[in-house]
Each structure stands twice: as structure tokens, then as C-alpha cells.
From Swiss-Prot:
Annotated ranges, domain Obg: 1-159
Originating species: Hydrogenovibrio crunogenus (strain DSM 25203 / XCL-2)
Lineage top rank: taxon: Bacteria
All copies of domain OBG-type G, residue ranges: 160-333
The keyword Magnesium is assigned to this record: yes
Function, as annotated: An essential GTPase which binds GTP, GDP and possibly (p)ppGpp with moderate affinity, with high nucleotide exchange rates and a fairly low GTP hydrolysis rate. Plays a role in control of the cell cycle, stress response, ribosome biogenesis and in those bacteria that undergo differentiation, in morphogenesis control.
Region span, Disordered: 127-149
Keywords: Cytoplasm, GTP-binding, Hydrolase, Magnesium, Metal-binding, Nucleotide-binding
EC number(s) recorded for this UniProt protein: 3.6.5.-
Positions that bind GTP: 166-173, 191-195, 213-216, 283-286, 314-316
Subcellular location per the Swiss-Prot or TrEMBL entry: Cytoplasm
GO CC list: cytoplasm
Protein name, as recorded: GTPase Obg
Amino acid sequence: MQFVDEANIRVEAGRGGNGVASFRREKYIPFGGPNGGDGGDGGSIYLIADRNINTLIDFRYTRDYKAQNGQAGMGQQKTGRAGQDLIIPVPEGTIVRDLDTQEMIGDLVEHGQKLLVAQGGRHGLGNVHFKSSTNRTPRQCTPGEPGDERNLGLELSVLADVGLLGMPNAGKSSLITAVSAARPKVANYPFTTLYPNLGVVRVSPESSFVIADIPGLIEGASEGAGLGVQFLKHLSRTGLLLHVVDIAPMDGVDPVESVHVIEKELEKYSDALAGKERWLVLNKTDLLLEEEASELCDQIVERLNWTGPVFAISAVNRVGTDDLVKEVAYGLEQNRLKAQEESVEE
């Protein structure tokens, strides 16, 4: 299935039903009073987060959504039937904006969360409401009001605890394959990953986290080069970034320089993303002798002046990946506890 993370749609809520003007007409009561009923309210439109949907592709083919109109009122003070609400499922992590005002309407992050995006029109009033001591036979009634109309922008930002960063062919897909049940395409050429992959990492029966792999970044990504820029937003919700580095690239690119390239792209994209906690994962140690790999990893860390956590692994052979997973799970738990403490203090 194609991965689509942006879509524009138009929504129109139902119009309220008209009120009606009518009068009692019964045997022996030729001139009864008003008994015109109200119309029904127009149907509203809601978006609802659904964990079973993971792309916005359906909105590429259906862009216009309209809820049901309310029915007109009837005699004998019968109210018209209300229009049925329209409920549209979207993936968890969908941000909704009004395209005309650029206002963010909502952020649907939990399964079952509903968001009203177009309010149905209010019903019209029947003539029974206009009877008074001076007007015993009112003929006025009111029409139903139109429902809201909106042009909406939907933007999907995947929900993951951990995001993988790296140049194309750094081994990110191999890493997510090694630590989770996800099976992205893995090959020895750049841009094997064309859209975000999510994997659930189970540390124990009681502990797990979600990891996201996005297409590799290249220099100029923040200006649109390569594939990664359109997916950088998917890292915005993560609590931790794992920066995967190929320590022995076949094209001879300096691993330290590749780290600097991505750091610059993160800074250009947003300060928030550049400031996220980031761990260094030095991958493909299996391509060198153990002593050579260890020495090269030390050199990379020293040249980067890296002071954060560092892990040397071979994702293909799953060497060092268990320790990485355990440390990530522990780090995420510590971050959660810290956030809880800060919220209590506030």
C-alpha cells in the first residue's frame, strides 16, 4: 500500500430542516391553532482516530464529504428527523488544520478520539413558536440554517517513541529488522526505504516501545533534496533519536562528515528536532576486524567530541543490538518518570 501522509479535503455539514406553518384541522374544530413542527438539525461531521489505519491514501480519491440534511417539520407539531452525523476514520497521529485560516483544529493521537470539524445547521422553527396573544394564527416559520463548510488539511505524523536517523544505506532498516518484527526492504543501495516503517520492540512481556525508520537524509534535505525531508516531521513526536552511522561506507564517505551533514539538516529543519536527545549508533562493525572496528569507533567519537551515549553494533549479525534495546527502554522509562515529576511540580 502506498504511504500518503498529507491530504486536503472539503467537508460540509448538513443543513437544518425547515420549520413548517400548519394549523389544526379536525372535525368540529375548523379554525384550530398553529401546530407546525420544527425541522431536524443537520448532521455534523467528525474525524475519529483509528489504530487500524496507517495512511491517508483514501483521501486522495475521495475529497468531498457531506453530512445528511435535517428533514422539514410537519403538522401536529412533529419534528423533522435530524440528519445523520458523518464520522470519518483517520490514522492515529493526524493533525487537522483549517486551510482557509491556517488554524490547527485538533490533533488526533489516541484510538477512538473524536474531533468535530463541521457543525450541523440548526433546525428551523415551526409556526407554533410564533403564537401570541395578539397573533393567534401565525403564518411565519423559519428555515433551517446551513451547516459549516470547511477546507481541511490533514497531516499524518507517525506516533513512535524512538526515531532512526542516518544517511542512505547506513543500516537503519537492518536495525529495525533486528530489534522488531517489522520487515522493511533491505538492500545494498541507497534509498531502499521509501516511506516510514514502524516496528514494535518487545523488551519483556511488560515493556515495549515503538521505533520509526524514515528514508535516509542527504545534504540539502531540509530544502527538499532526496526523500527524507518530507518525512522529518515523523520524528517530531519521538522521545529519542538513534543516529545510525555506517563506520565503513563503501563509497568512502567520512563517517564524521556524514554525522555533521545530518546535524546541519536537523538544525535547518527545526530547533525542536535538532534539540532532541540523540544517541550515536555506530553500525556495520562486522565489516572490519574486531580491533580495527573498536579503534575506528573510538576515533569517530573523539573527532565528533561526542559526550552522549554511544553503541557499536552490527545490525545484520545482531551484535550489540540487545544491549541497545535494553538501554533505550530504560532511557524512555526514565524520561517518562521525569516528565511525570515535572507535571506534578507544576
